[in-house]
Structure formats: structure tokens, C-alpha cells
């Protein structure tokens, strides 16, 4: 088992295997993710990073022929169990994807969409929640006077922050970020990275990134994956300066991948 410090883990992955039909995509993954920290997953394309992320909220169940075996413990409860309400799980474990995906509706309705699925709030309470979520995503000051406008009217960076606001509006405990800045310009990327630092005060964050410099900047822990296996996991500073595995060093230094 790859363990953290004495801090109790928020997520604990136990002997996780994942299959796309007969293809064995994740192999015996064992990992602990600390609360209110940022854990980055790096590795070449196709190594299983995004697949692993999607097991944390069972997003893979939206597609036929995919299955996970093993255990993923969220606060001590196995989220792969048959008795788990997947919709409630996804409220606890929010996700932001590679490309900004605002719903084709107003900024306000983008934020309230998920909240309405899980909570019954008064109009005043909902307005407060919308402002709270947009402030969390550092977007309130930019959109407070145009909440009725389409989310698609925003710039790319603003759209991604809207998606983050939408994810936090349901008050999740974990945020999954799958390449959240790969489609953004450098200035928007810097805004998102700054936001990640702020959000980890309240959320456990797991981020997939192909940008190793980004992983070094934003994460507390880093996992290097290759061909569906977890090669090395540890403190980000250690992974990037004194990795224990030669395969990790080769990838970090650009000799491979």
C-alpha cells in the first residue's frame, strides 16, 4: 500500500483493476489521497490517468462494457459497493472536464442545475448559493450583472471557472479535474491554477495533467502512471527532485514519454 503521512486519507484505493471489455486498463492500483490536498496524476497518454479519475465517481458506468474491481474507500465507505447511490456519490465527488462544458442555459441556471437535484432551497437560499459558488470560482465579480446571459457567452477561461462553480455548488467533498487547463490560454491557465490553490482549503482535489510543470506548481502529491500501473507516488517535491524509480526519473526528465 502506498501510504500518506499520518493524515487520515480521504480516498483509499485498494487493489483496483479496471476493464474496457477484455482490455485490462488499470492493474492493482493501491493509493491513498489525503484530505484538503492536491494530488496530481501524470504519465503518457493512455496510461490510465483519466480512467482512474473516473472510478472515483463511477462516471464510467455511463458507458456499457466497462467494469471496476477492488475497493475505493471514501471516508471509509466503499463507493464501488452495489448499495451506493451513484447520484449522491457524484454530488459528493464533483468533476470538471478537459474542455469547458457549460450547459446551454443561463449562467444562473448552470449553477442551480445540480443543486436542484439534491436540495430543496428557497429562492433566496438558491440566490445565495449561486453567489457563493461563483465567488468560490473567483467569477462572481465578472458575471454578477449578467447572470441571465448564456454560459456560452463567456470566454474560455470564464467558462471553465463556471464549470468549477457548477461543480462546487452542490458542496462536494472531492473535486476531480481532468486536464482542466489544456484548452485554455496561459492567462486563463494561471487563473485556474491560482483557484486550485484556494479551493484546496475546502476540498480534496485530484487533477490529471499532461503538463508536468503544472503538476509541480499546483500539487502536494504526485502519482506517475504507466501502462495502467502506478509506478511511483509521493510528495511532489520528492517525485520531481529525487524520484525513487528510474522510470519516473526518465519521464520527469523527458527521456521518455
Swiss-Prot record:
One GO BP: phosphate ion transmembrane transport
Assembly: The complex is composed of two ATP-binding proteins (PstB), two transmembrane proteins (PstC and PstA) and a solute-binding protein (PstS).
Keywords assigned: ATP-binding, Cell inner membrane, Cell membrane, Membrane, Nucleotide-binding, Phosphate transport, Translocase, Transport
Subcellular localization: Cell inner membrane
Enzyme class at the top of the EC tree: translocase
CDD domains: ABC_PstB_phosphate_transporter (cd03260)
Designated name of the protein: Phosphate import ATP-binding protein PstB
Record function comment: Part of the ABC transporter complex PstSACB involved in phosphate import. Responsible for energy coupling to the transport system.
Gene that encodes it: pstB
EC number: 7.3.2.1
Amino acid at each position: 500500500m502506498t501510504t500518506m503521512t499520518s493524515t487520515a486519507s480521504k480516498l483509499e484505493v485498494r487493489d483496483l483493476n479496471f476493464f474496457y471489455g477484455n482490455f485490462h486498463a488499470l492493474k492493482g492500483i493501491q493509493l491513498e489521497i489525503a484530505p484538503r490536498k492536491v494530488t496530481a496524476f501524470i504519465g503518457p497518454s493512455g496510461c490510465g490517468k483519466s480512467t482512474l479519475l473516473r472510478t472515483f465517481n463511477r462516471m464510467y458506468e455511463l458507458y456499457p462494457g466497462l467494469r471496476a474491481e477492488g475497493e475505493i474507500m471514501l471516508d471509509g465507505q466503499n463507493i464501488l459497493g452495489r448499495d451506493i447511490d451513484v447520484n449522491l456519490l457524484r454530488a459528493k465527488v464533483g468533476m470538471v472536464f478537459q474542455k469547458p462544458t457549460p450547459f446551454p442555459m443561463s449562467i444562473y441556471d448552470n449553477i442551480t442545475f445540480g443543486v436542484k437535484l439534491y436540495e430543496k432551497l428557497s429562492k433566496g437560499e438558491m440566490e445565495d448559493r449561486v453567489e457563493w459558488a461563483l465567488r468560490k470560482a473567483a467569477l462572481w465579480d465578472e458575471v454578477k450583472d449578467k447572470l441571465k446571459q448564456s454560459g456560452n457567452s463567456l470566454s474560455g477561461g470564464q467558462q471553465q471557472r463556471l464549470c468549477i462553480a457548477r461543480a462546487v455548488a452542490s458542496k462536494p467533498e472531492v473535486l476531480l479535474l481532468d486536464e482542466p487547463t489544456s484548452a485554455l490560454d496561459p492567462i486563463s491557465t494561471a487563473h485556474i491554477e491560482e483557484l486550485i490553490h484556494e479551493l484546496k482549503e475546502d476540498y480534496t482535489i485530484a487533477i490529471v495533467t499532461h503538463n508536468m510543470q503544472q503538476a509541480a506548481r499546483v500539487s502536494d502529491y504526485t502519482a506517475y502512471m504507466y501502462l495502467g500501473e502506478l509506478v511511483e507516488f509521493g510528495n511532489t517535491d520528492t517525485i520531481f527532485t529525487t524520484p525513487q524509480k528510474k522510470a519516473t526519473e526518465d519521464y520527469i526528465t523527458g527521456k521518455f514519454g
